């Protein structure tokens, strides 16, 4: 079992859902073209975009309202170029092997049978050291958003990993995972 996700007991068959595929394709294309305006159209203003990154040993995250390729988070790590010639595949997400520095499969994947829990894991870890870092409402909001989200991975030299979330009957990009 992948520790970065948990089984989604209410599996929604989005394989035939053109809206999800369109959002994923649109985000990958906008990111490839480094088009801030197009990326920002895929982010809901109420949800913002959460960026996961690793400033040291442990992952952390920050939430932003708008995305800007010229203002990366963290500032010392520019957003790398991403390239995709792959069609979207709805299947188990690829795994990255740190020892070989390779993915176990290549392509663009979205797994609709599990939900991402990276943010909850980061919060749980950070609360061990800073018990008052997050308000109860923030934790509840993160957990609720994860229940309505899917993780997408584009493998490659510069992988692109992001989450999409259903909100008010529409899908939006809500997390960019740079860790």
Annotate each PLM feature.
Residues 3-16, 21-22, 44-179:
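C-terminal-biased regions
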Residues 18-34:
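Short, aromatic-enriched amphipathic alpha-helices that serve as compact interaction elements
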Residues 27, 37, 162:
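Residue-level detector of short, conserved catalytic/binding motifs and their immediate flanks
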Residues 35-46:
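Short, well-ordered alpha-helical segments enriched in acidic and aromatic residues
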């Amino acid at each position: 079992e992948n520790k970065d996700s948990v089984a989604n007991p209410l599996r929604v068959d989005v394989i035939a859902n053109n809206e999800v595929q369109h959002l994923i394709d649109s985000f990958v294309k906008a990111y490839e073209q480094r088009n801030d305006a197009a990326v920002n159209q895929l982010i809901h203003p109420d949800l913002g975009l959460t960026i996961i990154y690793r400033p040291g040993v442990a992952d952390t995250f920050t939430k932003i309202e708008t995305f800007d390729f010229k203002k990366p988070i963290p500032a010392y790590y520019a957003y790398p170029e991403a390239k995709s010639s792959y069609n979207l595949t709805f299947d188990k997400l690829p795994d990255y092997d740190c020892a070989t520095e390779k993915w176990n499969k290549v392509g663009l994947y979205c797994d609709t049978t599990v939900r991402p829990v990276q943010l909850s894991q980061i919060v749980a870890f950070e609360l061990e050291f800073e018990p008052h870092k997050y308000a109860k409402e923030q934790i509840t909001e993160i957990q609720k958003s994860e229940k309505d989200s899917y993780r997408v991975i584009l493998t490659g030299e510069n992988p692109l990993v992001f989450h999409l979330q259903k909100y008010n009957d529409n899908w939006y990009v809500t997390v960019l995972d740079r860790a």
